Amino acid sequence: MQGEDPVSEIGDIFQLIIMEMLRKICKQDPSQKPRLMNAIFMMSESKSPSVLFECANTITQLTTAPSAIKVAIQSYLNLLQENNDNNVKVIVLDKILQLRKNYFKVLEDYINDILAIIKDDTIVSLEINQKVLDLITYLVSQRNIKEVVQFLEREILKATKMDEHGAQGTVTNEYRYLLIKSIN
């Protein structure tokens, strides 16, 4: 993997095979892990969503180092921002939610990126919004409470305006309920 060619020029399937091989080697021979983690980090720069997802999963399986977990979280967040498929977003959010207990401090640094997941003027998916709200309410701290409260207030106003314009009636009411529940 050394040389001038960027990771993105290697096909997705080949990248996934390499990722699986690296994961297996690291699990079978942990002494190889420090050397092979660099290759995994290089692959986290892939443009392929499936490779990015597998890379993040591999990192979280092989290490607990905060710097490595940051790479995994950033990969997950990139997937959330670049992907329009709600099913993919739900799966990725579930992965991030699994990290929240062990990596609270690391995730806390990404609160703005997490807030940005809910950015549309429409409610695309209540399930996605609920998972994001669950995550941000878990990550609220003295350091970020002001940002989170301002975000929740903006979202309540947005839902109220949508309701006044007759957009997405029941969904808007459910979303507003989730927001109010998050504040409490």
Which stretches of residues belong to each language-model region?
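Extended alpha-solenoid helical-repeat scaffolds
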Residues: 1-184
